[in-house]
């Protein structure tokens, strides 16, 4: 399982909102797009369109990490994660582990101190030791989910990064934008091919009528 930057943002948002706004979860495409583009608690800040978020959802659905849920009597399709703690997932995690993974998905590499400070709405860590124990558990799995990065000069704590996200270090807005552009190009090419096919079929039908 390897996620690109957009897929990581989507999963992170779904994990976060499931805990912080359970009455609004699962999320509609519009709500999920707003969550992805939040100015606070996100690094880098993204400016994704609903089309781009939908493309990410489609990829995650193929990976069986997201599923649709239609509301009772509602036409709006909503989405929920199948990343962990579901009957479909092999990952069964504690609330502390989910909070840490969500923060790393949404903000990239962080120190234990940063994780404790930012996790308040998802899990109330009593001290740094609890955060470190959580990180150790995630790093010690048969397939590790996090890895400790070398300590940077002048820093007291090492940062921890996810092993399931592409280019977890040095992720920039530019690289995300490039990834988005590539997705747009592929979708446009597919649409152009579809239009050409429909035009050919229409021409064939017109010939048959004459």
From Swiss-Prot:
Question: Which Gene3D superfamilies does the record match to this protein?
Answer: Winged helix-like DNA-binding domain superfamily/Winged helix DNA-binding domain (1.10.10.10)
Q: Which SUPFAM superfamilies match?
A: Winged helix' DNA-binding domain
The UniProt entry, under InterPro entries, shows: DUF480 (IPR007432), WH-like_DNA-bd_sf (IPR036388), WH_DNA-bd_sf (IPR036390)
Q: Record's Pfam families?
A: DUF480
Q: Which HAMAP family match?
A: UPF0502
UniProt protein name: UPF0502 protein Sama_1967
- Family classification: Belongs to the UPF0502 family.
């Amino acid at each position: 399982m390897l996620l690109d930057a957009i897929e990581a943002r989507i999963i992170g948002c779904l994990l976060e909102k499931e805990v912080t706004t359970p009455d609004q979860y699962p999320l509609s495409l519009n709500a999920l797009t707003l969550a992805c583009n939040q100015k606070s608690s996100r690094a880098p800040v993204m400016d994704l369109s609903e089309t781009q978020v939908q493309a990410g959802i489609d990829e995650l659905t193929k990976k069986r990490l997201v599923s649709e849920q239609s509301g009772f009597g509602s036409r709006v399709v909503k989405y929920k994660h199948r990343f962990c703690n579901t009957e479909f997932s092999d990952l069964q995690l504690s609330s502390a582990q989910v909070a840490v993974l969500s923060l790393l998905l949404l903000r990239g590499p962080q120190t234990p101190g940063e994780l404790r400070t930012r996790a308040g709405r998802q899990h109330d860590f009593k001290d740094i030791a609890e955060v470190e124990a959580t990180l150790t558990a995630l790093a010690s799995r048969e397939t590790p989910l996090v890895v400790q990065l070398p300590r940077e000069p002048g820093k007291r704590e090492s940062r921890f990064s996810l092993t399931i996200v592409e280019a977890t270090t040095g992720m920039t807005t530019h690289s995300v934008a490039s990834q988005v552009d590539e997705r747009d190009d592929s979708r446009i090419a597919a649409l152009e091919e579809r239009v050409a096919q429909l035009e050919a079929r229409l021409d064939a039908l017109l010939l048959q009528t004459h």
